[in-house]
């Protein structure tokens, strides 16, 4: 279960990072 929790947390971190970059991309467009 610990591996699954780590994976979900890691993907959540990536999602937030991509979301921030996506917002910045929208602002620059």
From Swiss-Prot:
Keywords: Hormone, Phosphoprotein, Secreted
GO biological process: adenylate cyclase-modulating G protein-coupled receptor signaling pathway; negative regulation of apoptotic process; positive regulation of insulin secretion involved in cellular response to glucose stimulus; protein kinase A signaling
GO molecular function: glucagon receptor binding; hormone activity
GO CC annotations on file: extracellular space
The UniProt record lists the keyword Magnesium: no
PTM annotation (Phosphoserine): residues: 2
SMART domains linked to this entry: GLUCA
Compartments in which it is found: Secreted
Highest rank taxon of the organism: Eukaryota
Keyword Phosphoprotein among record annotations: yes
Stretches of the chain forming a coiled coil according to its record: none
Induction (UniProt): Produced in the A cells of the islets of Langerhans in response to a drop in blood sugar concentration.
UniProt cross-references to Pfam families, sorted A to Z: Hormone_2
Job description of the protein: Glucagon plays a key role in glucose metabolism and homeostasis. Regulates blood glucose by increasing gluconeogenesis and decreasing glycolysis.
Family note: Belongs to the glucagon family.
Name of the featured protein: Glucagon
Species this chain originates from: Chinchilla chinchilla
